[in-house]
Design a protein with these regions (language model features):
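TPR alpha-solenoid repeat register
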Residues: 102, 136, 140, 173-174
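Canonical positions in the second alpha-helix
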Residues: 91-92, 125-126, 164
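Alpha-helical segment of the N-proximal tetratricopeptide repeat
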Residues: 59-84, 173
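Bacterial Sec signal peptide processing site at the extreme N-terminus
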Residues: 17-41
Length: 175
C-alpha cells in the first residue's frame, strides 16, 4: 500500500504533468511542401482548365518561333528539367510578352520549381491580359487557389475558388 505522503507525491506529479501538457503548443501543421506536392498542384491546375467546358474558348494565333520554344519547354518539363523549361518559356515570352496562355504555362512551371510568389504573379497577370471566362481563366484562378491552399491563406482560398467558379460561361439553352 502507498502511504499518504506517497499518494500526495504521485498526485502532485500527475497534476504537474497535466499542467505542463496544457501549456504546450499544439503541433504545427506540416510544411506546405508536404501537404501538396508541386506536381499535384500543377495536375489540379491543368485539370481545372480541361474541365471547364465553357461556351467561350480562346485560341491564340502566334509566331511559329514561339510555338517552337513552347514545344521545347513542354519536352523539358516532361523530362523533369524544369529550369530549362522555364528558360524556353522566357524565350517565347520575349517574342510574345503579352500572351496570357504562355504566362499561365510559366506559372505552372514556376510551381514545379516552388517559386510560388512568381507563379501567383504570373497567374494574376495572365488573368488580367486574358479572357475572363473559359479554361484559361479557370487555370489562372486554380493556380492562385493551389498556392493559397499550400500556404494556408484561408480568405484567399475562398476568393480564388469563387473566382474560378465564375470562369464558366454556359451556352444558351436551345429548344
Amino acid at each position: 500500500m502507498m502511504s499518504k505522503s506517497g499518494r500526495v507525491a504521485a498526485t502532485a506529479a500527475a497534476a504537474g504533468a497535466l499542467l505542463l501538457a496544457a501549456c504546450s503548443n499544439p503541433p504545427l501543421p506540416p510544411p506546405a511542401s508536404e501537404r501538396s506536392s508541386p506536381t499535384a498542384m500543377v495536375e489540379a491546375i491543368r485539370a481545372a482548365g480541361a474541365a471547364d467546358k465553357s461556351v467561350v474558348q480562346v485560341a491564340p494565333l502566334r509566331d511559329p518561333a514561339v510555338d517552337g520554344f513552347l514545344d521545347q519547354a513542354h519536352a523539358a518539363e516532361n523530362a523533369g528539367n524544369y529550369q530549362d523549361a522555364l528558360d524556353r518559356i522566357d524565350a517565347a515570352l520575349k517574342l510574345s510578352p503579352d500572351a496570357p496562355d504562355i504566362l499561365q504555362f510559366r506559372a505552372e512551371v514556376e510551381i514545379l520549381l516552388r517559386s510560388y510568389p512568381a507563379a501567383e504573379a504570373d497567374a494574376r497577370h495572365s488573368f488580367m491580359l486574358g479572357p475572363k471566362v473559359g479554361s484559361l481563366c479557370a487555370s489562372n484562378w486554380q493556380t492562385i487557389l493551389e498556392i493559397a491552399q499550400a500556404q494556408d491563406r484561408g480568405p484567399d482560398i475562398a476568393t480564388a475558388r469563387a473566382a474560378r467558379d465564375k470562369c464558366h460561361k454556359a451556352g444558351p439553352v436551345r429548344m
